Amino acid sequence: MGRSLKKGPFVDGHLMKKVEALNATNDKKVVKTWSRRSTIFPDFIGHTFAVYDGRKHVPVYVSEDMVGHKLGEFAPTRTYKGHAADKKTRR
């Protein structure tokens, strides 16, 4: 279920301030963030965010197609290495 339209999209205030400061100076630094819950705004296009996945910061370059999604969608938290193979079938 999505967020109510009357509430509007959510973005952490500190993250928005950082992006606005980068846009004012036309700087393209990597923005390190733990805010996986923040919605991607059109102001974020062209910036790279280092989104924390619980272990490390994953670089996420924001493009036009990502607007409206959350930052956490592009930094997976779980690593799946597959099920254990049956030793009898490998011989």
UniProtKB/Swiss-Prot annotation:
Q: Which GO terms describe its molecular function?
A: rRNA binding; structural constituent of ribosome
UniProt keyword rRNA-binding, yes or no: yes
Q: Which InterPro entries match?
A: Ribosomal_uS19 (IPR002222), Ribosomal_uS19_bac-type (IPR005732), Ribosomal_uS19_CS (IPR020934), Ribosomal_uS19_SF (IPR023575)
What's the superkingdom here? Bacteria
Q: Which GO terms describe its biological process?
A: ribosomal small subunit assembly; translation
Q: Name one GO cellular component term.
A: cytoplasm
Recite the UniProt keywords alphabetically.
Ribonucleoprotein, Ribosomal protein, RNA-binding, rRNA-binding
- Record's function text: Protein S19 forms a complex with S13 that binds strongly to the 16S ribosomal RNA.
Q: Which family does it belong to?
A: Belongs to the universal ribosomal protein uS19 family.
Alphabetical list of HAMAP family matching this protein:
Ribosomal_uS19
Q: What PANTHER family does the annotation carry?
A: RIBOSOMAL PROTEIN S19P FAMILY MEMBER, SMALL RIBOSOMAL SUBUNIT PROTEIN US19M
Query: What's the name of the protein?
Result: Small ribosomal subunit protein uS19
What is this protein's gene name?
Answer: rpsS
